[in-house]
Design a protein with these regions (language model features):
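Low-acidity, Ser/Thr- and Arg-rich intrinsically disordered low-complexity segments
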Residues: 4-9
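Small-residue (G/A/S/T)-rich helix-start motifs and N-terminal tracts that mark the onset
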Residues: 12-98, 106, 135, 192, ...
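N-terminal small/polar loop signature for handling phosphorylated ligands or for N-terminal nucleophile
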Residues: 84-163, 298-311, 315-316
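Internal gly/pro-rich beta-alpha loop/helix module
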Residues: 134-135, 140-232
Length: 498
């Protein structure tokens, strides 16, 4: 088991709230709920839930200078109701910096704070108030945002982000993030996000996830449970707490634990071959065979370790005896012919790193892979891969563009696509899982080679490709978290920790 600090959604309501929805679906959930629960009641309940979260969190003191950034719509109304609720709980340093209300609910909440000990800050004093705040609450914009933030709100967000001493809370999602908002736009940088009903998928883009902070707390502002359960899901929010090391049968022997082949390494990048092959072995593979080219063979023989058999690539004439194959780590260029031969074995194949470049070239020339396939690009590799095959960079656009594009690639290639970042996304045939990791210690050279070896091992043990990818990511992050508790570490230490 992993400790309770592993990144699992904190849900003070129900276990089905680990589903993710789009901003449009969140708006529909809100509208549907309002047919049964008045909108003002939902807003009041949201404020109460957030106040309870603050009280339980223990990070905010009663006399802290707490500044609320209040937008013109219902997110601003939530912020005002939240401020009033905290006033009722005995918090004394409450201030609000407000834009002109445009929604009726925001106007009601603006009037409602008049008789509470909440100080209004004029716009000309905004900079001073933001700089001196000990807690900043972002209630500027919510799920209805469809364009980059500009004007005074943009200035306030930039100023708030610059206040490194303040504890920052985002209501529903950090302002500046949305399905259709370019990820290069400014966004509020929260330490914790209180999101309503269900978490939003746009919060899990590689470029936006850090803005949500280390903790995302899912709260229910009295949405009827059946509406939450029935809400269409974009994907599932997974936890490394579910990591499982595959058990071995008491009568297991080396062949029953999976025989895997690895095509990796070159004269310039010999370390990738060692890391991926050792990771496959330590993850549980019974037989690991590393195929190296002529240039890297001498290094591979001495560095791969006694547990790995090393062969010349020319000896790989019969791949039928292997249960799964990994191709690409440290390969270099010009490996298209070899990759095609590997893919035509119809064995489960993991394609990583330079193998993705070779695969893109094959597909552009008309080749279509057939057989179980797992692709493991990092952000830069997916950007180049999508540009080559789809004619557009799906990573540096909007959160929706990434979800649409990665699903399109998975469908087009019949593959599981694993996007490696602070949030791992695992995608196949409309199924999408998000593994929220945020473990910077694991962001080290060779970490991806280790992950590829783990997934290879699980494929070799007959796990279905999607499950092999998901469980591989969980194990990778779990071990990384355990090592990270003791400080920074190398990929070799990560592989040995398996």
């Amino acid at each position: 088991m992993v400790d309770s600090s592993t990144r699992k959604p904190k849900m003070w309501y129900s276990s089905y709230m680990d589903s993710l929805i789009s901003c449009a679906q969140a708006q529909n959930l809100d509208k549907l709920s309002q047919k049964h629960v008045p909108a003002i009641v939902l807003m009041e309940q949201a404020a109460c839930r957030m106040s309870q979260a603050v009280e339980r969190g223990g990070r905010v003191k009663k006399d802290d200078a707490i500044l609320f950034l209040v937008g013109p719509g219902n997110n601003g109304g939530d912020a005002l109701a939240f401020a009033r609720s905290l006033a009722c709980c005995g918090y004394s340093g409450l201030q609000v910096l407000c834009m002109e209300p445009r929604s009726e609910l925001c106007r009601i909440q603006s009037e409602a704070i008049a008789d509470f000990p909440i100080r209004r800050i004029s716009h000309d004093k905004a900079g001073t108030a933001i700089d001196s705040a000990q807690v900043i609450v972002d209630g500027l914009f919510g799920v209805g945002l469809s364009r980059p933030v500009d004007g005074a709100a943009k200035e306030w967000i930039a100023r708030a982000n610059a206040n490194s001493r303040a504890w920052k809370i985002a209501i529903d999602l950090p302002s500046g993030i949305g399905d259709q908002v370019p990820v290069s736009s400014i966004s509020f940088h929260a330490d914790v996000t209180y999101t309503m009903g269900l978490a939003k998928s746009c919060m899990f883009h590689p470029a936006t996830c850090a803005s949500c902070g280390r903790e995302i707390v899912v709260l229910n502002p009295s949405f009827p449970p059946r509406f939450i359960e029935a809400c269409p899901s974009v994907g599932s929010w997974e936890s490394i707490a579910s990591a499982v090391e595959p058990p071995l049968r008491l009568d297991a022997f080396k062949n029953s634990r999976g025989s895997v082949a690895i095509f990796a390494g070159s004269r310039q990048y010999s370390g990738a071959a060692r890391l991926s092959s050792q990771a496959a072995f330590h993850a549980g593979s019974g037989l690991v065979t590393l195929f190296a080219d002529r240039d890297s063979f001498p290094v591979a023989v001495t560095s791969a370790g006694l547990s790995v058999m090393v062969r010349h690539e020319e000896e790989a004439f019969d791949l039928s005896r292997f249960d799964a194959i990994l191709a690409g780590p440290g390969w270099g260029t010009g490996r298209e012919a070899l990759l095609r031969r590997i893919l035509e074995s119809e064995k489960p194949v993991v394609v990583d790193a330079d193998g993705l470049v070779a695969l893109a070239n094959l597909v552009r020339d008309g080749y279509r892979p057939h057989g179980p396939l797992v692709l493991t690009p990092h952000v830069g590799e997916l950007s180049r891969f999508s540009s080559a095959l789809l004619g557009r960079d799906i990573v540096h656009d909007t959160p929706q563009a990434l979800l649409t594009g990665i699903s399109q690639l998975a469908t087009q290639l019949g593959a599981v696509v694993v996007l490696k970042s602070a949030v791992n996304q695992i995608v196949k045939d409309g199924r999408m899982a998000f593994l929220d990791c945020k473990n910077p210690a694991i962001a080290v050279a060779g970490s991806g080679d280790v992950l590829a070896g783990i997934i290879l091992c699980l494929l070799g043990q007959k796990l279905e490709p999607f499950e092999a990818a998901l469980q591989g990511c969980r194990l990778h992050q779990w071990k990384g978290k355990l090592l990270g508790a003791g400080g920074y570490f190398t990929s070799q230490e990560l592989e040995e920790c398996l």
